[in-house]
Curated annotation (Swiss-Prot):
It catalyses: an N-acylsphinganine + 2 Fe(II)-[cytochrome b5] + O2 + 2 H(+) = an N-acylsphing-4-enine + 2 Fe(III)-[cytochrome b5] + 2 H2O. GO terms for biological process: ceramide biosynthetic process; fatty acid biosynthetic process. It comes from Oryza sativa subsp. japonica. PANTHER family: SPHINGOLIPID DELTA 4 DESATURASE/C-4 HYDROXYLASE PROTEIN DES2, SPHINGOLIPID DELTA(4)-DESATURASE DES1. Belongs to the fatty acid desaturase type 1 family. DEGS subfamily. This is Sphingolipid delta(4)-desaturase DES1-like. Its EC number is 1.14.19.17. GO terms for cellular component: endoplasmic reticulum membrane.
Length: 328
């Protein structure tokens, strides 16, 4: 892969003190070209998921209805339901927004944005439009220093050095994931961001006005706990954290794919971002020679455990590339 680890990784049992630096292109574009040349029928999988709208509408309705039922519940009950139920729904919607960022519900981009704003409602915090801007750069510039905001900052990586700090980082990783690009690579908001913000504030205010603060708190708690020490959140780590220096993207082939828009098929997704999650398994079926030899996971919970307990793994365990030089 043409990668080199930073100082401190060479010694067994010691956490890296720098990222893994790659001096080759990210692997997905090359693999995409090879697979399409060998298996051109892959192109038949391209295009929107016709059931995306119905699936999103069902989850949004169920989560908002649940929030209204908990308006007079105890805080213990609200937190319990949020962790064991609401977190799965809100994380499902977060990954629906990921799907929509690739225009995989409709062929018209603006329709996907509107559906993303709708899917955003139970999450409680406006993020759909902003996520799309940064996520597409993650695909186009995977690992590129200063552009790919999926990678932890230097401050995060230097602060998180042991089991305890990694545990805290995992609990709050959703905050780091959301706030990192706003500090490191802020983008000026546009009309779509303001639309997302206004509609979200209207929903939040309506929840408080008609049902009380506890209903809104349930929605936000569902988002927070579902993005931390939670099985669904394991994909944040499993996708690109390097447990093997020879591989920078990892797939997950476990049952939670059914609830997460099959985001676990992450090598397949980066190879073919125009294929909706419901069809990604077919990529592996058509071209098994490209995927069966790659390391993969069957448990996101195990990935979280490995990340926390392995003393050689931490926020520095990511592959990075130097930004391309601009023509003078």
């Amino acid at each position: 892969m043409g990668a080199a680890a930073g100082d401190g990784r060479e010694e067994e049992g010691v956490m890296a003190t720098d990222f893994f630096w790659s001096y080759t292109d990210e692997p997905h574009a090359t693999r995409r070209r090879e697979i399409l040349a060998k298996h051109p029928q892959i192109k038949e999988l391209f295009g929107p998921d016709p059931l995306a709208f119905l699936k999103i509408a069902a989850v949004v309705s169920l989560q908002l209805w649940t929030a209204t039922l908990l308006r007079d519940a105890s805080w213990v009950k609200i937190l319990t339901v949020a962790y064991f139920f609401g977190s799965f729904l809100n994380h499902n919607l977060f990954l629906a927004i990921h799907e929509l960022s690739h225009n995989l519900a409709f062929t018209t981009p603006s329709y996907n944005r509107w559906l993303g704003i709708f899917a955003n409602l139970p999450i409680g915090v406006p993020m759909s439009i902003t996520f799309q801007k940064y996520h597409l750069e993650h695909h186009r510039f995977q690992g590129v220093d200063g552009i790919d905001m999926d990678i932890p900052s230097q401050a995060e990586a230097h602060a998180v050095k042991n089991t305890l700090s990694k545990s805290v980082w995992v609990v709050f990783q959703l905050f780091f994931y959301a706030l990192r690009p706003l500090f490191l690579k802020p983008k000026p908001p546009g009309l779509w961001e303001f639309t997302n913000l206004i509609i979200q504030i209207a929903l939040d205010a309506s929840m408080v006005y008609f049902f009380g603060w506890k209903s809104l708190a349930y929605l936000i708690l569902s988002t927070f706990v579902g993005g931390g020490m939670h099985p669904m959140a394991g994909h944040f780590i499993s996708e690109h954290y390097v447990f093997n220096p020879d591989q920078e993207t990892y797939s997950y082939y476990g049952p939670l794919n059914l609830m997460t828009w099959h985001v676990g098929y992450h090598n397949e997704h980066h190879d073919f971002p125009r294929i909706p999650g419901t069809r990604l398994y077919k990529v592996r079926e058509i071209a098994p020679e490209y995927y069966n030899n790659l390391k993969s996971y069957k448990s996101w919970s195990q990935v979280i455990y490995m990340y926390i307990m392995d003393q050689t793994v931490g926020p520095f365990s990511r592959m990075k590339r130097k930004a391309p030089k601009k023509d003078s």
